Every structure is written in C-alpha cells, then in structure tokens.
Amino acid sequence: MKKILLSFMSLALVLTLGSCDLDEPNYGKTTSDNFYKKQSDINEALTGAYLQLRNTWNEYALNFYFVGDCSTDDALKGSSDGDRAEVMELSNFTVYTTNGEVGRRWEILYRLINRCNDVIANAPTAQGDKELLARYEKEAKALRAFGYYSLVTTFGGVPLITAPMLPAEILKIPRASADAVYTQIISDLTDASTLPAKGEYEASEQYHVTRGFAKTMLAKTYMFRGDFDNAEKVLRDIVEVDKDYDLLPDYGMNWRPQYENSIESIFELPNKVYDKSIATGTNVPHFFTSRDVPGYQGYGFHVPTTDLFEAYDVDDPRQTYVFTRTGDRYIGDEQAQDNHQSATGFHDYKMTVPKAEKQGTDVWMISYNIRLIRYSDVLLLYAEALNEMNKPVEAKKYLNKVRKRARETNPLDPRKDMQAYVPATTSSTLPDITTTNKDELREIIWHERRVELAMEGWRRDDLMRQHRFGEVMRAYANKYNVQKGRNFDDERDYLLPIPQGERDKSNNILTQNPKY
C-alpha cells in the first residue's frame, strides 16, 4: 500500500511538499527566492515545519522517549538485545559518537529549525493577511525555540542558525555557546507568548502551538537555567492570569481517545486515521507494547523499571495508568496482556492502544495522539519555582492540587474487563503535603513530578536541571546491581556527543563534547 503523508496541522489537506524535502538528512537546505511569495506558501512551509515532529514513522516521538526516559532510572530499552542497539548505548551510558539515535535527534531538530527559518524570514514580506502571517511567524518562532531547547539541553552549545542558508554556508558555522542558544530561545518564546490561546483557534487549527505552549517552554527554559524568579513569573501568568488549562477530573482520562487535546493538554502530536484504506496515524504504540499479544504486534521497547514501580505509594491509583501487567485485558481484546518477555513484567500503559480503539486496515498505523506536555507538568513546575523562591505555602497549593486529582482517580480502568492489580485507593490516599521546610518540599515535588509524569519523556530533563543525574543513575546501578548507570561520568554524560557524521561534514569545525 502506498504510504501517503497527511498534513499535520491542516487536518485533512494533503501536504504537497516533495519527499526530498521531508527526507532531507542534513541541517542546511537550499531555498527558492521565488517560492515564499503568498500566504499559502507560508502556510505550506509552516505545515512542513510541524511535520518534522510527526512524519510517517514518528521518528521524533520515538527519539523523544528513548532519550528522555530510556537513559534514566524510569525506563529500560526493552525489546530484544540487538534491536535498536543504539538505545541500549543511551541506556547504559556507553554512547559512541556514531550512535544512530543521537544522529537522528540532531537531524530531525535541525530540519524543524530549517523549516521555521523559512517561515520567519519570508512571512513579513509575503502577500496576504498580515495579521495571520504575523501569527505564522510567531508559531515558527515557538517551534524553532522548541527545537533549540531540545538540542541545547542534550548537546550543549550547537550551531545557531536563525536564517535560511545554503548547506555549504551551514557547514562553516561553529557551535555557539549554550548561553547564546538560550538567549535565542528566550527571545523567540517571549515573542511567541502573544500567540492565540488554546480555545481561540479554528477547529482545523486546534493542534497549532499556542501562547500556553510558548509560555510553558519559556518556563521550562528558565527552570533549566535555574532562574526561578523568571520561571515563577511566567508560570504565574499561565496558571493565575491566562487560565487556559485545567486538570481533567481523572488521571486516566488523559490516555483515552475521547479526551485527546483536552483542557489538560498543552501540546500533543495528532495522528489521525482519516481514511481507513490509507496508512496514516502513528506506529509508536507498536514499538512500546508487548511482543506477546496477538493483534498488538509490539516490539516491547520503553519498559518501565522496577525502580519506577517502587516509587509509587501502594495505593496510588496512577499505577493503573502507567504500568500494564500480565493478566490485564482490554475490552474488545481476545487475549489478556502477556509481558513475560519484559525484564520487569511491565509495559507502557500510556502507549497501549487496545483493539477496540484502533482504526484503519493497516494495524501499524493507529489513530492516537502523542501527548507531549500536560498542565500537571506546569502546576508542578510552578510549585517547584515557588518553593525555590521561599513561598512554600503557595507551592503546597499547586502540589496538593495534583495529588488531589490523583487521589480521586478511579483505580479500576474502565478500558479493561480484567485488571491484574487494583490499588486499594481510599480517601486517605496521597494526603495533602503539610511541610513548609524548603528542602523537604523540594524532594517531595521532585518525587511527585516523577510519579505524575512517568514515561512521558521528561525524566532526563528533570534530572539534568536538578543537577543530580549522575547521583541518581549511580544509585540505581548499585541498588539493582546492573550496568545501567554504572558508567555514568558527570564530565561526559550530562550531554550527548556531537554526531560524528556532522563533524565530518563540517571538516571538524564542530568541536566534540568532553570525553567522547
């Protein structure tokens, strides 16, 4: 069956960009002076930017989870030992400079930045609705900032490219300092913070980035930099002024199809099957579900660790929506989950799509959105920033809001007709936190982020900005007597290596990170 790419943000319009554009392997590209003349040209270019985060095989989403979770104490690589061996290198901190997953991350994010630069450079002079063109420019700035944030937090300083350039020109650009990259990110996101709110877009544009996305990424940037003062101000704006978001009443709702792009969702990648005879949607759930259940065709990657499981209170109902277990059976499935090939006995609930919720004739392409940022993330960042700014009473308010929602979550999953384990949740489960001790509250908030956002790709980000990545990983290795984490070197492993292929193309103008 011929694979057809559908427009990510136009929600039904076939994208007319050529395959050479979509598959471009490097981070420089030739642009045509005659192309970006009309509003429709800019819209098409912006759609091309969004598509870098959602191509047919969803390599960005896979990379997001492999880097963000599998290189931490939350997730094992999973699958068979030889399958995607480069992810095992990430997991064990034995990463070579030729690692395919590392190179893939670099390529995808620079393709995203490239497309954004085309929009930003040409939108101001294009013919059409000037207000709409200005919005397109701000969307591109928000996406470019997301790309650079994802690069600088994993590679450190990188080439800072803010205008369309030829490949030959790109190859002469050295790495900018991390400070310079962060300055550009903050500038872009500050400008994009005046984008429309989540509810102000037309239905056909409901997945476009919003002011909430821009402000959330701005807050994450400040938090990563340890600038809690500015982070608090931005987060206060999101939570107390804009009020564009809220928590769903039940934690488990976040992964049910009827709640896609819900009031809690700040950013997600849509993967819709519009025509059951055309292979669209996403294949990520197949990578992350069990290899032993007919109809799932899973590869068994992204396996929750025992350490993550042990981080939960025994009566915390969120366990139901983080771990699938042998014996769980979803309504409509003929067979219960069988996780005997999983090293921990668990698989990733948040990427499990049962038969009753699948659409299309191609079982590899599932109508399922990738949830990247939720409002509970913002509330916990806000609690953390407030605590660091010596406002523990305010911090507890937002921490306890997240815990209250968890406490009131149904521990019995309505998507299942058999559930191997049901937490004994009561009204006294996850009681409100009362301490006002700054150090104690910090540890509690960090723990709450882990169990609330488990398997959602943000664990590495948290451990890095908390300056305890090595400490946590070495403790993990010692606790379980495993290789994972034992090799962690603080001078090396906070950053990934600059891909050797990119260094070769630049004639080593791109310098390498320490100890690689």
How would you describe each model-predicted region?
Residues 144, 211, 218, 375, ...:
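Structural register within alpha-helical repeat arrays
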Residues 84-94, 310-375:
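Flexible, polar/acidic helix-loop-strand segments at domain edges
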Residues 1-28:
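Bacterial Sec-dependent N-terminal signal peptides
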Residues 20-84, 182, 190-196, 208-342, ...:
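An aromatic- and glycine-enriched ligand-binding surface/loop that stacks and positions planar moieties
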Residues 43-47, 51-57, 81-155, 176-180, ...:
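Conserved, well-structured interaction surfaces
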Residues 20-24, 50, 74-81, 95-99, ...:
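Long, intrinsically disordered, low-complexity segments
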